[in-house]
Amino acid sequence: MVNLNGIPPRGKRNYYLAIGLEGSANKLGVGIIKHPVLEKHEDSDLSYECDVEILANIRDTYVTPPGEGFLPRDTARHHRNWVVRIIRKALTEAKIDDPTKIDVICFTRGPGMGAPLHCVVIAARTLSLMWDIPLVGVNHCVGHIEMGREITGAKNPVVLYVSGGNTQVIAYSEKRYRIFGETLDIAIGNCLDRFARTLKIPNAPSPGYNIEQLAKQCKNKEKLVVLPYTVKGMDLSMSGILQYIDTLAKDLFKKNLKNKLLFDSRTGEQLVTVEDLCYSLQENLFAMLVEITERAMAHVNSNQVLIVGGVGCNVRLQEMMAQMCKDRSNGQVHATDDRFCIDNGVMIAQAGLLEYRTGHFVKDLSETIVTQKFRTDEVYIAWRE
């Protein structure tokens, strides 16, 4: 059994308050949540009985012009300019007049982009010193998983973590989130974002979302553009697919009539549209994700899938995963909307507060060093059986 009342709340209250700061990429988020103090059981307290009340979930995104990505230094400048305003807005929305009543400050320790991570941890350290509140450094992926579990009610699913910087298939075992499969090169979100740059489509609200909308407009869904399909056991590779479809898109824009895949060799008629390329890319990438996820489900004998991360908002990915689960003894797919799929401060507060309640928190500021590389399976999950 897991005791989640290991550390009592401040002021002898019957609830805990946590603030979470997320800024590992171009999204800066601040979330504030409340946990109840659990009733005592004969053995101890069970982690799944911990109901979360979301008091604030504020976010701002650094958006670049079409055709451009976001550089670490520019993203960090955005975070520095906005972090104080967003923290104040979150406190106001949560109706917290005295911040010293907060039990713990949670921040993203990694993985992520170095400069933005440093901006967030500096803000967290400052608040900790000002308010005399302990700190907890949170693994970004674990934050996604714990928020997804809480929102959807998934018990012990296979987790598909798909975002701009990560692509992993994960399952819980013996106090760790074990990685069963992952990308061998670039993440799926990075693949979609870079193709969006080639197409020079807007980055707002996100490149992947705009590719999804173009894919929906495809009028020739019966005939896919043939793309590389690279699955190696439980792992997958997407750099070759990106390079290939980038070349096709550039030939399409240049009207390279020598490319017989895009143009009729006799008449010069265009055979493929930008919408066709977006649709085929999605179908190809998502089929690879479904394959390795199903393989993990068979390995751990699970019939549930939890999709987390920014790409998890994609409706087509959810549909394909749902069809696979339906074919596997009426399995279930769990996913959240963009409030929780996309990076946010609430997920950091959730994972951090669970860690804090089991007695794990930063004892000295020297322990708050952020890292760009922080594996999901490095974290000891003390709050689960």
Curated annotation (Swiss-Prot):
UniProtKB keywords: Activator, Acyltransferase, Cytoplasm, Metal-binding, Nucleus, Transcription, Transcription regulation, Transferase, tRNA processing
Cellular component GO terms, alphabetical: cytoplasm; EKC/KEOPS complex; nucleus
Compartment list: Cytoplasm; Nucleus
GO biological process terms held by the UniProt record: tRNA threonylcarbamoyladenosine modification
Disulfide-bond pairs as recorded: none
GO MF: metal ion binding; N(6)-L-threonylcarbamoyladenine synthase activity
Catalysed conversion reaction: L-threonylcarbamoyladenylate + adenosine(37) in tRNA = N(6)-L-threonylcarbamoyladenosine(37) in tRNA + AMP + H(+)
Cofactors (names): a divalent metal cation
Signal peptide region: none
Positions bound to a divalent metal cation: 140, 144, 161, 343
Cofactor: how bound: Binds 1 divalent metal cation per subunit.
InterPro entries, sorted: ATPase_NBD, Gcp-like_dom, KAE1/TsaD, Kae1_archaea_euk, Peptidase_M22_CS
Enzyme class at the top of the EC tree: transferase
Principal location listed in the UniProt entry: cytoplasm
UniProt: substrate binding residues: 161-165, 193, 208, 212, 314
Enzyme Commission code(s) on record: 2.3.1.234
Assembly information from the UniProt record: Component of the EKC/KEOPS complex composed of at least BUD32, CGI121, GON7, KAE1 and PCC1; the whole complex dimerizes.
Xref: NCBIfam families: gcp_kae1
Function summary: Component of the EKC/KEOPS complex that is required for the formation of a threonylcarbamoyl group on adenosine at position 37 (t(6)A37) in tRNAs that read codons beginning with adenine. The complex is probably involved in the transfer of the threonylcarbamoyl moiety of threonylcarbamoyl-AMP (TC-AMP) to the N6 group of A37. KAE1 likely plays a direct catalytic role in this reaction, but requires other protein(s) of the complex to fulfill this activity. The EKC/KEOPS complex also promotes both telomere uncapping and telomere elongation.
Annotated family: Belongs to the KAE1 / TsaD family.
The name this protein goes by in its record: tRNA N6-adenosine threonylcarbamoyltransferase
Lineage of source species: Eukaryota, Fungi, Dikarya, Ascomycota, Saccharomycotina
Gene designation: KAE1
